Amino acid sequence: MLKLVIIENMAEIMLFSLDLLLFSTDILCFNFPSKMIKLPGFITIQIFFYPQASFGISANTILFLFHIFTFVFSHRSKSIDMIISHLSLIHILLLFTQAILVSLDFFGSQNTQDDLRCKVIVFLNKVMRGLSICTPCLLNVLQAIISPSIFSLAKLKHPSASHILGFFLFSWVLNMFIGVIFCCTLWLPPVKWGQSSVCHTALFLFAHELHPQETVFHTNDFEGCHLYRVHGPLKRLHGDYFIQTIRGYLSAFTQPACPPVSPVKRASQTILLLVSFVFIYWVDFMFSFSRGVTWINDSLLVWFQVIVANSYATISPLMLIYADNQIFKTLQMLWFKYLSPPKLMLKFNRQCGSTKK
């Protein structure tokens, strides 16, 4: 009974925060300056970018509030809650800084690049992007430890809060240092750096983004090998099973209850999703690296890179919400209590009746 009351309170908090956030994101979308209307294809990009940023900020805020609430009031493993809260906060700041850069016409105008505001926002955006790569690396390592008795790093399964905070501090300092180097190479002309310095800086930035993704691949390989030894070949990783998983995710809110998912299925889904996220970052990095080496400022290429770079911050909270049974049950209760079509129709009829009186 107490657990049901806690879930209902979480649903009320989520509903209020979602209404407030959707109002704020509407203001964000419709009150941006109109400098970028001069760019070719801006209307098409605006159709994709602003709803994507608004949806990503909303989903990450729900995830952030839920895990903060769980970290403070619940008795679950607090290391995972700290990491996911940190990741969702990073994604919120990343999408906000990207939206500010879009509103300031940073990608289309050369005059705004001399503004101190733009330099600060670019620095923050680069730091948030680096943190959004490093933090899933730690989360993936913790989730990949399936059998602590076999894995040599079993002591990392339940790290203390001080170790997690130490990792956060180290990642923030490292990515701020990387952001300073990136901004120096961005604002200073190549003549002052020299050709060799530019190449060394590009290789350094490449290594900085390569190592966390390499760790993700290694942990996924370990997880897949362990599942192969224990459960045999993972045939469900291929073909129709992945399509059925996506269909089940899209139709989950139309059913009052969802069947329990086995750890093997959930681990296989995690492997596929993390590999797809790494693929998204590689596409983004190839665009960034090619533009940095060739110094080509094609507006269509830049806009496509912006959409790709924001896709991970938009999709990852949905996957984390779907993987957490408690959040999923809370959202289902919120749906059937307030947002299902019969409830909305009843609420609409009551409002119409009150206006007639």
From Swiss-Prot:
Keywords from the named record: Cell membrane, G-protein coupled receptor, Glycoprotein, Membrane, Pheromone response, Receptor, Transducer, Transmembrane, Transmembrane helix
Organism, as annotated: Gorilla gorilla gorilla
PANTHER family to which the protein is assigned, alphabetical: VOMERONASAL TYPE-1 RECEPTOR (PTHR24062)
Gene Ontology BP, a term: response to pheromone
Single Gene Ontology MF annotation: pheromone receptor activity
Record: glycosylation sites: N297
A matching Pfam family: V1R
Assigned GO CC terms: plasma membrane
The keyword Mitochondrion belongs to this UniProt entry's keyword annotation: no
Membrane topology according to the record: Multi-pass membrane protein
Name used for this protein in its record: Vomeronasal type-1 receptor 5
Superkingdom of source: Eukaryota
Transmembrane parts of this sequence: 4-24, 53-73, 82-102, 131-151, 164-184, 270-290, 301-321
Record-stated family: Belongs to the G-protein coupled receptor 1 family.
Record has Membrane as a keyword: yes
Topology feature Extracellular, residues: 1-3, 74-81, 152-163, 291-300
Function: Putative pheromone receptor.
Record topology, Cytoplasmic segments: 25-52, 103-130, 185-269, 322-357
Location in the cell: Cell membrane
Main location: membrane
